[in-house]
């Protein structure tokens, strides 16, 4: 195991975070799972209970793609770049104390016992008996075939100036985004378009392109300060005619059927659908930190069948999982954002952030004043 761009051991993490902002906080945000250079899974999912419906407090809604063929060794090649990079350190070189053999045996025994106990839980039994697991074990899983292209940041991105785009994934995605003709669907848990993004969306809207964004609400986000950065752009986006949807953090019991907890829901999927013919799925959020600071990876799939299914599923489900935002002007000429719930979401209109307290809204208003957008 290796750790990419870790904090140093001779200075406290807090001091490094404060004094090294823009360097020590830059990280590998890539997510991939590749087996024998044959198959690879890409998306936004981390390894943790909350990403697999196993956390009683938080339930991340994520998206993955399983790909086979030439793209698998491409992902392995990207992984090797990071593994062999000068910023990657073996865990043993960072450990303050290496366990002695007896301790290692004890730790392994406890781990094996834990794994054995988990096999009898309702959660594991449900996974093993799920429809997907049964189909996969039987070898009858059907694939949709189409050309795919891996787009990934080079680890050198973290060693060069942030204005140097040579190693940026965005340079590979740019041509696809510049060729949008009719519709752009965006799924991004953290969405901060910035001035460049606003200019891009404005051009699309002037050409009559439909732009729809699904992101987190204040109640569903796990990083309120990032939501504050997004909130600064909502009115401008709505004025342009961009359709904004924010995930409902309290999906009703019908939506949660089959899950083990009534946990808070949060969007974690990162994807784009272009003209219902091209799909991007990966680790990239549309915010400054992902685009400029961190490294990311994803796949561009040129398949009308996949893109159309994806978009149709969104059309069918969005009103039952998210609030639609609207910009209203009152009788005094002041603009107000309202949140509409329909379908399975509460059928009502709200004039404040759904499922939030006064203190949460007040805190978010304060965070919006902080000049830290480049780090969000």
Please state what every model-predicted region is.
Residues 1-31, 35-376:
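Charged, low-complexity intrinsically disordered terminal segments
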């Amino acid at each position: 195991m290796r750790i990419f761009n870790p904090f140093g051991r001779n200075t406290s993490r807090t001091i490094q975070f404060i004094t090294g902002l823009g360097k020590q906080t830059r990280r590998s945000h890539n997510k991939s799972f590749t087996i024998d250079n044959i198959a690879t899974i890409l998306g936004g999912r981390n390894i943790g209970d909350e990403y697999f419906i196993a956390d009683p407090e938080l339930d991340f809604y994520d998206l993955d793609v399983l790909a086979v063929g030439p793209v698998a060794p491409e992902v392995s090649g990207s992984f090797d770049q990071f593994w062999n990079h000068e910023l990657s350190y073996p865990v043993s070189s960072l450990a303050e104390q290496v366990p002695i053999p007896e301790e290692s045996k004890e730790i392994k025994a406890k781990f094996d016992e834990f794994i054995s106990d988990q096999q009898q839980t309702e959660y594991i039994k449900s996974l093993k008996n799920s429809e997907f697991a049964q189909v996969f074990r039987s070898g009858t899983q059907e694939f949709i075939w189409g050309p795919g292209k891996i787009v990934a940041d080079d680890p050198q991105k973290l060693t060069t100036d942030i204005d140097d785009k040579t190693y940026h994934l965005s340079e590979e995605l740019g041509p696809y985004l510049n060729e949008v003709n009719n519709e752009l669907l965006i799924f991004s848990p953290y969405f901060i378009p910035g001035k460049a993004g606003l200019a891009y969306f404005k051009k699309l809207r002037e050409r009559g392109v439909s732009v729809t964004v699904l992101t987190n609400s204040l109640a569903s986000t796990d990083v309120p300060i990032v939501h504050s950065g997004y909130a600064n752009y909502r009115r401008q986006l709505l004025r342009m005619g961009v359709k904004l949807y924010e995930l409902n953090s309290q999906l009703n019991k019908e939506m949660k059927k089959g899950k083990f907890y009534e946990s808070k829901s949060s969007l974690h999927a990162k994807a784009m659908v272009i003209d219902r013919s091209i799909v991007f799925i990966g680790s990239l959020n549309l915010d400054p930190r992902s685009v400029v600071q961190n490294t990311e990876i994803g796949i561009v799939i040129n398949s009308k069948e996949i893109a159309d299914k994806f978009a149709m599923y969104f059309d069918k489900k969005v009103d039952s999982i998210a609030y639609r935002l609207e910009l209203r002007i009152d009788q005094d000429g002041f603009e107000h954002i309202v949140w509409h719930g329909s379908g399975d979401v509460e059928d009502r209109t709200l004039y404040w952030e759904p499922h939030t307290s006064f203190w949460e809204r007040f805190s978010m208003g304060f965070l919006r004043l902080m000049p830290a957008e480049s780090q969000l």
